[in-house]
Amino acid sequence: MGELDNAVAVITGAARGQGRSHAVALAEQGADIIAVDICADIDTIPYPLATKSDLDTTAERVQAAGRKVVPVVADVRDLAGLEAGVQAGIDALGEIDIVIANAGVVAIGDTQTRAEPLFTTIVDTNLTGAWHTLLATVPSIIRKGRGGSVVLVSSSQGLIGRGGDGSAAMFAYAASKHGVVGLMRSAANAYAPHKIRVNTVNPSGVATPMILNDFVINGMTENPNPAVAQTLLPDVALVESQDVTEAVLWLVSPRARYVTGITVPVDAGHVVM
């Protein structure tokens, strides 16, 4: 018996990294998964995004944990496409209990100051995409009528301004992740009458393909500004996906049944540096 037996969870950005970690962990606790990812590159994002093969691997790992999964190829920036994909998952698995809005992009290392298309892409994915995820999923939780849990993945950069270098990329990332915290607080109030809890996790840099790619690594190497430092604790360069997943598991579990409207930094002290 798991803590989440027979729950249905929607996870965006599920093809790899944190999203895959969350999907597998929830499945191991008994949840069925609607796994959403764009499975395509975005022209303005300078590193490779997840592929359909990545999403298939996530699905295989959920199935290996003994749970059902519906892989959905959808872009969180496209509300109609996201709603259609989520509905396909609902048709197969039933109404939703848990939502993890994890899809996000970053472009550390892009030093352009007036790159408006890049700024727009980051905000549209990280913030508008999280809002779209609420619109596509929360009505199902309400229909089910037994409450639920929503976790929006923000960042330690959603709580502080460290890392700002004047670039459009970093302005957009910090602004979008601060926006996710505001979205969470508003949603926690709006959905409380339906017994839906809404919280954020706020990781610092996580050892996933979003950070561990040539573009971002080279950018951080060329700009060793201490403001980009990700952690305070010694010998911790990046946190691991599993560290974030443990926080997510707690937030969506009955152990956090009275927890709503909070931010949970998983950052090895980044926000207090």
Kindly label every feature range from the protein language model.
Residues G2-A40:
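Canonical Rossmann dinucleotide-binding motif of NAD(H)/NADP(H)-dependent dehydrogenases/reductases
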Residues K52-S53, V73-G85, E116, S241-D243:
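The beta1-alpha1 cofactor-binding region of Rossmann-like NAD(H)/NADP(H)-dependent oxidoreductases
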Residues A192, R197, V259-G261:
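Short, small/polar-rich loop/turn modules that mediate ligand/substrate recognition or access, typified
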Residues V248-L249, T260-M273:
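Short C-terminal tail/terminal secondary-structure segment
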